[in-house]
Amino acid sequence: ALLSGNTIENGGITVKPNVKKSEVLKKIATGDLIADGTCDFTATSSVTLTERILTPKEFQVNLELCKTPFRADWDALSMGLSAFDTLPPDFASFLIAHVAEKVATKIENNIWQGADGTEGEFDGLVALATADATVVDVVGTTVTAANVIDELGKVVDAIPAALYGAEDLNLYVAQNVYRAYVRALGGFASNGQGANGVGGNGTNQSLGDVMFDGVPVFVANGLASNYIVAAESSNLFFGTGLLSDSTNEVKVLDMADLDGSQNVRVIMRFTATVNYAYGSEIVLYTPA
């Protein structure tokens, strides 16, 4: 469940499993490494180590429902003939899938726009980057099909030269930014104002994976509207405990044998958090 949000599932972030309490993200900084050769050993640069901490936060899902309402409907036979009913298996499967989907959606939102002070959330990447003076900030606006090319251009122009061209560099965009970009490509971005866009097919086409100025555009469903982040996926980290806790352990407990009640409980426990290593290698576009 935890790993089925689109940022994680599509490889937009590096997953660090088996983090029991915390994990240190080591950062190394050096100066110019190469110097003229001599007979003696002389350090050609200093090495500075700093760190950021990945500390997963514990979360839980606790739900309870009564089996009695199912007796009167078409699922009654699937509950068995005993007075100690069981939850209809089809509904139990649906309930597990429903919980897994809701958790995945919430985690996707937390990855980008979570706030640690809010129940059920941890600080997301936007909150962390906003508080970090080393992050490259770009002041944004409301993104539309008419201005999306210029706004994406501002982000790409702000990407550090050493980062541009990196294999895993992405432009993480909110859904509305992606829709605006696709509409622009279908209408006027490539072939001139009023033209039929990429391939001459207007908006009647599937563009598939798109790029901007050589950088892949990654739709991050958890990003709030009008936000854009440029970063390497290898610089963004999602930390959790055992992957089995995160992905498979949605438990359905029938309470009949435990307390004699007609209740069923749905339980899930997991840990999660995000962080990044290098703030100076992240560009954050924030709408004004």
Annotate each language-model stretch with its function.
Residues K67, A129, Q175-V177, F270:
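Short, flexible loop/turn elements at secondary-structure junctions
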